[in-house]
Each structure stands twice: as C-alpha cells, then as structure tokens.
Amino acid sequence: IYKNAIIRIYDTPILYFPKFFHPDSSVKRRSGFLQPRLNNSKTLGSSINIPYFKTLGSNKDLTFKPTLFEKFSKFEKEKYILQTEFRKKEKNSSLIADFAFLRDYKSSTNSKTKNINHLFLNYNSKLNIPNFLKIRFEANIERVTNDTYLKVFENNLFDTPLLPASQTTLNSNVKLYLEKENQNLTTGIEVYENLGVKHSDRYQYTLP
C-alpha cells in the first residue's frame, strides 16, 4: 500500500491517491489498479487507459477500464470511454462479458453526435440430461452501435479475449453440443452482421 501516491505523465501530475495499492504477483487475487497504458493514434490523438481490478468473491470479478483522451474533434463533450469486463466461473458454467460506452461521438461521415457502445459476451454451460454423456450449451454475442467502431477504437479496447476476429463482420451465435454413445449432434443458429452493408442485407443467418 502506498500513501500520497501521484501518477505523472511526462512529469505532469495527473492523478493523486491518498492511498494506492495494486495486485501483487505473490497474491492470487486482490483488488487494485493494473498497469496503465498510453496510446497514440492519428485518428483519436493521445490517450491513457487506467484499469482497476475488483474481486467480487471467489468465483467472479470485474475490471473497470476507462480510457481518457486528449481534446479532439471527434469528441463533442466527454472525452473518455467507460469499458468494463465481468467474469464469473461456476462448477458447470462460465460467463465473460465486455461492455463499453462513449457519449457524444461524432463520426467522419455524420455531423451529428451520438452515443455509441459495444457488447461482447461468451457463455458456456455443461448440462446434465439423462441418456447423454456430455451436453454443452454456448452463446456468443458481438454487437456494436457504430459501423466503424472497431476500426476507430481498435487500439483502445484493451485486454479483452472477446474482441471480434473481424473489424467488418460480427458473429453472434447460440449452439448446443450433444454427445451420446457413438453419436454426436451439434445444433444452433449463427448470425453474421456485415458492418459495411446497410439495412436488412447486412444480416446472414446460418442454421444447422
């Protein structure tokens, strides 16, 4: 634990904490600030990410990851992204969700400002049903409210294993895996969203 701690950027005081502590490698789980990250982008300018890890019990935690930006034309008022990751692990299930929110963003193609956000989620569960050896349920959600969101904020969405593989196509799905003696069955639905296409043509559905 540090007393009267000051965070400086290029010798300029940015934040002051009467008391400051952070996770230690010798401690398995402990709430505290994680290592800050600096970023510089031609599109968004300079920014700093200051993550805070919070334990919520033995099987769940939350990481608050705000990103602060310098004054830039794309931001009408607020100049920060509020990003949060939640994780929960049970005996037969796991959940991880990442959400971010930004107010009054002005894109290069629209003079009006609007609130934008993202939601990435993965849920896995093992089910017990008679006559089946293994049953697994999986759900994934990839959602953004701005078509160029992933391209613009790629370098600012830190440390999320849920970041979509493509910046132009989102994949949300629900799947059920069943295993029986000498038999395997996979069923579900997948939805692909092409961010470069307008209206209903941007969605493609895949069924078993």
Describe each region flagged by the PLM.
Residues 2-208:
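Outer-membrane beta-barrel proteins and related beta-barrel translocases across Gram-negative bacteria
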